[in-house]
């Protein structure tokens, strides 16, 4: 209390005089002042942690929650654990973009022949070009729907083929598969798994599979979980860069999706399947 009195009245009286009257040592007063202004080691660590976490969270475009941020920071040399990163996010009021409830799309009969389910929900692949998976989703713009077809290599979860169109046709699926074939140097005997949509059952798509010696596989009727890996990618795409945004044209949506696939998802977005690496990093590490 004496030191508090001195602090309040130091503009009126000299420190020396007040210390003499109150019978306290001037050295004690100065030590007390230093202790009040000194930041503890723990406080310094928290401030440093908060600044580093904020920077990483911003770089991730607010997409990473604590586990992925921890992997990102460890790769940069910061030995933070998940609890520390989670606490920092909580204290700063930072929240990754929230997911939405998954609503499976209903199956529509089309009367076309379907392929046998060769995958049977076994999404593991020991190397590249053993198992691919594809699907189509729809994206809303002010101009109308934009349809996106993708092909994913289940080994690394990399998007190796994609195509976008204002119409959901067999050509959309064929174009995505053609890009995958071009990127992967046209491998043979790959299992290519899709749902039973009319685009994948079409004569054009089936002919493309046969022409390149690919093995077609299709999900069970109405079972979206047979193609869970592609559904998971679409979920990440929509949560991380589409939900909450307003797209006035298909062209803007197209550019956004292209940037997400080619610049973000494949190159640097950390994937739990890849041990915290991005699909591109995983492939480079395992093919070196």
Swiss-Prot record:
Record GO terms (molecular function): DNA binding
Annotated Gene3D superfamilies: Ribonuclease H-like superfamily/Ribonuclease H (3.30.420.10)
- Fetch the InterPro entries from UniProt: HTH-like_dom, Integrase_cat-core, RNaseH-like_sf, RNaseH_sf, Transpos_IS3, Transposase_IS3/IS150/IS904
The alphabetized UniProt keywords are: DNA recombination, DNA-binding, Plasmid, Transposable element, Transposition
Q: Does the keyword Amino-acid biosynthesis apply?
A: no
Extract the Pfam families matched here. Answer: HTH_21 (PF13276), rve (PF00665), rve_2 (PF13333)
Per its UniProt entry, which superkingdom is the organism in?
Bacteria
One Gene Ontology term of the biological-process aspect is: DNA recombination
UniProt xrefs under PROSITE patterns: INTEGRASE
Positions of the Integrase catalytic domain: 124-287
Q: Which PANTHER family match?
A: TRANSPOSASE INSF FOR INSERTION SEQUENCE IS3B, TRANSPOSASE INSF FOR INSERTION SEQUENCE IS3B-RELATED
Quote the function comment for this protein.
Involved in the transposition of the insertion sequence IS3.
The UniProt family comment states:
Belongs to the transposase IS3/IS150/IS904 family.
Name it: Transposase InsF for insertion sequence IS3fB
Q: Which organism is it from?
A: Escherichia coli (strain K12)
Taxonomic path: Bacteria, Pseudomonadati, Pseudomonadota, Gammaproteobacteria, Enterobacterales
| Encoding gene (name) | insF7
């Amino acid at each position: 209390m004496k030191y508090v009195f001195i602090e309040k009245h130091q503009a009126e009286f000299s420190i020396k005089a007040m210390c003499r009257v109150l019978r306290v040592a001037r050295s004690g007063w100065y030590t007390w002042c230093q202790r009040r202004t000194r930041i503890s080691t723990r406080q310094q660590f928290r401030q440093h942690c908060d600044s580093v976490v904020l920077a990483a969270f911003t770089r991730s475009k607010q997409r990473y929650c604590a586990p992925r941020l921890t992997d990102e920071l460890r790769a940069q040399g910061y030995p933070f654990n998940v609890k520390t990163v989670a606490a920092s996010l909580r204290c700063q009021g930072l929240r990754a973009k929230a997911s939405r409830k998954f609503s499976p799309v209903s199956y529509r009969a089309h009367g076309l022949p379907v392929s046998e389910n060769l995958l049977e929900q076994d999404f593991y692949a020991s190397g590249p070009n053993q198992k691919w998976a594809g699907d189509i989703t729809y994206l809303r713009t002010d101009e109308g729907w934009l349809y996106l077809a993708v092909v994913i290599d289940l080994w690394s979860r990399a998007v190796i083929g994609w195509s976008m169109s204002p119409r959901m046709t067999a050509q959309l699926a064929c174009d995505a598969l053609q890009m995958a074939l071009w990127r992967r140097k046209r491998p043979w005997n790959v299992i290519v798994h899709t749902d039973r949509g009319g685009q994948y059952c079409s004569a054009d798509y089936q002919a493309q599979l046969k022409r390149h010696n690919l093995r077609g596989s299709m999900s069970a009727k109405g079972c979206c979980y047979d193609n869970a890996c592609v559904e998971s990618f679409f979920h990440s795409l929509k949560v991380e860069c589409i939900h909450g945004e307003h797209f006035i044209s298909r062209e803007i949506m197209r550019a956004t999706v292209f940037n997400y696939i080619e610049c973000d998802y494949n190159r640097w977005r950390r994937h739990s399947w890849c041990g915290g690496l991005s699909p591109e990093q995983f492939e480079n590490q395992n093919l070196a």
